[in-house]
Swiss-Prot record:
Mitochondrial GTPase that mediates the disassembly of ribosomes from messenger RNA at the termination of mitochondrial protein biosynthesis. Acts in collaboration with MRRF. GTP hydrolysis follows the ribosome disassembly and probably occurs on the ribosome large subunit. Not involved in the GTP-dependent ribosomal translocation step during translation elongation. It holds the Pfam family EFG_III. It is found in: Mitochondrion. Its EC number is 3.6.5.-. GO terms for cellular component: mitochondrion. Residues 68-353 form the tr-type G domain. One of its GO terms (biological process) is ribosome disassembly. The lineage of its organism: Eukaryota, Metazoa, Chordata, Craniata, Vertebrata. Keywords: GTP-binding, Hydrolase, Mitochondrion, Nucleotide-binding, Protein biosynthesis. The gene is GFM2. This is Ribosome-releasing factor 2, mitochondrial.
Length: 777
């Protein structure tokens, strides 16, 4: 039985063996001891000898613990709020790492890509598995940079709970709002951790108020800080009326003590904590009827007598219902408050069985999983992160991909430890692991055990659909909600060092696209050049860097350009005929259509059929027409940018017998392009939400600079000693802004960007842009 397999020989692998060693019975520990010796001797050892009977059951419970003991969580926040540092401390205190990683030193576990370690930011979410007090925690560290919003979206899709990390001196920041909205969309329960309580300017009350005001959430204060800024030395457990103090002489924060608050020694702190606990009890009672009955009945006279366990259970229910969010505090960098955060994760966030996933009823215990991330490994090929919702997955078994309608074989299952992986013999519901051997599975694909299982689930969904909705919707309901991929806002050309290297570049880009669906690659039809489309300057830069590091290709990037869109302003009709003979076969088709603007903002064209043709069209002809429309809308007449906010109506389609659907599509595309050229047109440019945090002394030059960039200031807020400028600015005007802002403010300011919408350019700016693009200025 191949229970565990070691793929590399290094110190971190030995660390992971220590981790398993701590959880096993004596016989398994002896086996692991022998295995560790083999690793130290440099051997690739494939099985654990001596695992029999109950020991194998013990190993099974280690690899796949009871579902009630599993927590699938993510850490999310604004950039620089301390997500990765918090993750590193969590791993250290859980016993999964043997030393403290530091973002500034570039030795963190979850930031495993070279670019991440150099830049001090998290780009790809690294999944890590560890145990804490009998619970299995699958933790995913997500990026806070706006260019990597898709990574956050991708991971929230498979989480059961999340920890939102805040900088206690800044409160809710721009990217926090974005991630919070994403968590709301996926109905992910969460708890808040006010980090950096040791930082100068840290304010617990300010941070809590910003959660209440900006996130419209109801904070449950489970802790109070003991001191703020440099005076921060511990926290008060409001639920248990205890104080937690960390030993100032302890280097790693493991040495702390929990003491009850007493009237004699802490009268002021006890009074403050009692008031906070009473307020917490009243708040939870307002949100949970079961708890309200308990409080009003047995403990109405004296809240002090209410057992902490009863309050914790009620907080757990409220958190799951997402009617409020527990709030804790600490300083990950100073090693304070992380262990109580781990306790809160197991206590208040849900297990997989506590989340209500409606689609599980259709699978009746069969395998149902979601592929939520793809990585490429040089030795093992594609590694697919998989969340198992029901059933079981084993190595050397076939699976069916519903999205791709294909069958593949899983060769291995791996337990992820950032870029370190341990092979496991099976994976049960609620768990997250890596699969090896899936060549065609991509991000967002739904995985089941077989095609027959998918058909059986489809029949059950259809029966349910007949009760609740139209029959033609049940097929879509079979697919798990995939990952919403945003449209790119930047693009540039990319060239290999020589034409001989073009196939290598194509392969690298294909692999990177499978890993990162927000990266789009297309071929410029005029120049024949390869074009990269991405979410921001940093995104494109990282891709360029990865091609060099991972694929050994020195590529050349063209100038970074903004991804504009086009729209028409009036209705226009056009007719076209395509008459072509290929071999001895004549293809003849005539089409008449109308293009008109629509008010709803959509990149996809609205396709309509006039009553005179709607009943006569075959399904193949409809598909050919729609393919032609979509093809024409990819390139507008002004800049070759996508055309949005357009409706296309088919009025007539005359097809000569034997005409291929490809020719029909070509004729429709040419006809629609003719209509678009005749219509009045405008260019739409991406508008970015902008938030600049700057000290008072530099506010004026920052505002003056934004005015020159066509910026529109909506609000200027005060945040401690800083000013926060909130507004929006065209993306074209903000390229390279980080360098300018650094110069204007002597490096003291920060900013965050997020795509707001696409807005019509004024005629003067549009004329200038067209002149620049066509080489007239």
């Amino acid at each position: 039985m191949s229970n565990l397999r070691i793929f590399a020989v290094n110190q971190k692998k030995i660390s992971s063996l220590h981790y398993f060693n701590n959880m096993c019975s004596s016989k398994i520990r002896a086996s692991l001891k022998r295995l560790k010796l083999h690793v130290l001797l440099g051997r690739n050892y494939s099985s654990l000898p001596g695992l029999i009977g109950n020991d194998i059951k013990s190993l099974h419970s280690i690899i796949n613990p009871p579902i009630a003991k599993i927590r699938n969580i993510g850490i999310m926040a604004h950039i620089d709020a301390g997500k990765t540092t918090t993750t590193e401390r969590i791993l250290y205190y859980s016993g999964y790492t043997r030393s403290l990683g530091d973002v500034d030193d570039g030795d963190t576990v979850t930031d495993f890509m070279a670019q991440e370690r150099e830049r001090g930011i998290t780009i790809q979410s690294a999944a890590v598995t560890f145990d804490w007090k009998g619970y299995r925690i699958n933790l995913i560290d997500t990026p806070g940079h706006v260019d990597f919003t898709l990574e956050v979206e991708r991971c929230l899709r498979v989480l059961d709970g999340a920890v939102a990390v805040f900088d206690a001196s800044a409160g809710v920041e721009a990217q926090t709002l974005t991630v919070w909205r994403q968590a709301d969309k996926h109905k992910v329960p969460r708890i808040c951790f006010l980090n950096k309580m040791d930082k100068i300017g840290a304010s617990f009350n300010y941070a809590v108020e910003s959660i209440r005001e900006k996130l419209k959430a109801k904070p449950l204060l489970l802790q109070l800080p003991i001191g703020e800024g440099k005076a921060f030395k511990g926290v008060v457990d409001v639920v248990r009326t205890e104080k937690l103090l960390w030993n100032p002489n302890s280097d790693d924060g493991k040495d702390f003590e929990r003491k009850p608050l007493l009237e004699m020694s802490d009268p002021k702190l006890l009074k403050e904590t009692t008031e906070a606990r009473n307020a917490l009890i009243e708040q939870v009672a307002d949100l949970d009827d079961e708890f309200a009955d308990l409080v009003l009945g047995e403990f109405s006279e004296n809240f002090d007598l209410l057992p902490a366990e009863k309050l914790q259970t009620a907080i757990h229910r409220v958190t799951l219902a997402q009617t409020a969010v527990p709030v804790l505090c600490g300083s990950a960098l100073k090693n304070k408050g992380v262990q109580p955060l781990l306790d809160a994760i197991t206590m208040y966030l849900p297990s997989p069985e506590e989340r209500n996933y409606e689609f599980l009823q259709w699978y009746k215990g069969d395998l149902c999983a979601l592929a939520f991330k793809v990585l490429h490994d040089k030795q093992r090929g594609p590694l697919v992160f998989m969340r198992i919702y029901s059933g079981m997955l084993k190595p050397q078994t076939a699976i069916h991909n519903i999205n791709g309608n294909c069958t593949e074989r899983v060769s291995r299952l791996l337990l992820p430890f950032a870029d370190q992986h341990i092979e496991i013999p099976l994976l049960t519901a609620g768990n997250i692991a890596l699969t090896v051997g899936l060549k065609h599975t991509a991000t967002g694909d739904t995985i089941v055990s077989s095609r027959s299982s998918a058909l059986a689930a489809s029949r059950r969904a259809k029966r349910e659909g007949e009760k609740k909705q139209k029959e033609n919707n049940e097929a879509e309901r079979l697919l798990l909600a995939g990952v919403e991929i945003p449209e790119p806002v930047f693009f540039c050309t990319i060239e290999p060092p020589s034409m001989a290297k073009q196939p290598d570049l194509d392969h690298a880009l294909k692999c990177l696209q499978r890993e990162d669906p927000s990266l789009k690659v297309k071929l410029d039809p005029d120049s024949g050049q390869t074009v990269l489309c991405g979410m921001g300057e940093l995104h494109i830069e990282i891709i360029h860097d990865r091609i060099k590091r991972e694929y050994g290709l020195e590529t050349y990037l063209g100038p970074l350009q903004v991804a504009y869109r086009e729209a028409i302003l009036n209705s226009i009709r056009a007719t076209d005929t395509l008459d072509r003979t290929l071999g001895d076969k004549r293809h003849l088709v005539t089409v008449e259509l109308e293009a008109k603007p629509v008010e709803t903002s959509s990149l996809l064209p609205v396709i309509e059929y006039a009553a005179s043709v709607a009943g006569d069209l075959s399904q193949a002809s409809r598909e050919a027409f729609e393919n032609g429309v979509h093809s024409a809308c990819l390139q507008g007449p002004l800049l070759g940018s996508p055309v949005q906010d357009v409706a296309v109506t088919l009025h007539s389609l005359v097809i000569h017998p034997g005409t291929s659907t490809t020719m029909i599509s070509a004729c429709v595309s040419r006809c629609l392009q003719k209509a678009l050229k005749k219509a009045d047109k405008q260019i739409l440019e991406p508008l970015m939400n902008l938030e600049v945090t700057v000290s008072r002394e530099y506010l004026s030059p920052v505002l003056a600079d934004l005015a020159q960039r066509r910026g529109n200031i909506q609000e200027i807020q005060s945040r401690q000693d800083n000013k926060v400028v909130i507004g929006y600015v065209p993306l074209a005007e903000i390229m390279g802004y980080s360098t300018v802002l650094r110069t204007l403010t002597s490096g003291s300011a920060t900013f965050a960007l997020e795509l707001s919408n696409y807005q019509a350019m004024n005629p003067q700016d549009q004329s200038t842009l067209l002149s620049q693009r066509h080489g007239l200025s």
